């Protein structure tokens, strides 16, 4: 899967994207757990997960060929 990082998470990880090889589908929760294990420095950061440009729930599945984006909260006025 391709993972896209934005804003603060992009700055912390010092990369805009990476490819992660999945052998099988994962739930969004499993993906987040994997990400936090790999990058503990983002464990307390808030973000929403979008899969193939659609926001998803933690129980939804991510397939090995999906594009996943970590979208930070948006503030505005």
Curated annotation (Swiss-Prot):
Keywords: Molybdenum cofactor biosynthesis, Nucleotide-binding, Phosphoprotein. InterPro entries: Beta-grasp_dom_sf, MOCS2A, Mopterin_synth/thiamin_S_b, ThiS/MoaD-like. One of its GO terms (cellular component) is molybdopterin adenylyltransferase complex. Pfam families: ThiS. C-terminal thiocarboxylation occurs in 2 steps, it is first acyl-adenylated (-COAMP) by MoeB, then thiocarboxylated (-COSH) by IscS. Disulfide bonds: none annotated. The modification Glycyl adenylate is found at residue 77. The keyword RNA-binding does not apply. The modification 1-thioglycine is found at residue 77. The keyword Phosphoprotein applies. Pathway: Cofactor biosynthesis; molybdopterin biosynthesis. One of its GO terms (molecular function) is nucleotide binding. Belongs to the MoaD family. Heterotetramer of 2 MoaD subunits and 2 MoaE subunits. Forms a stable heterotetrameric complex of 2 MoaD and 2 MoeB during adenylation of MoaD by MoeB. During catalysis MoaD shuttles between the two heterotetrameric complexes. Involved in sulfur transfer in the conversion of molybdopterin precursor Z to molybdopterin. This is Molybdopterin synthase sulfur carrier subunit. It comes from Staphylococcus aureus (strain N315).
């Amino acid at each position: 899967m391709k993972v896209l990082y934005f804003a603060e998470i992009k700055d912390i990880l010092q990369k805009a994207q990476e490819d992660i090889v999945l052998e099988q589908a994962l739930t969004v929760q499993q993906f987040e757990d994997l990400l936090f294990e790999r990058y503990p420095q983002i464990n307390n950061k808030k973000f929403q997960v979008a899969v193939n440009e659609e926001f998803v729930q933690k129980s939804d599945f991510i397939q090995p060929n999906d594009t996943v984006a970590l979208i930070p909260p948006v503030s505005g006025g």
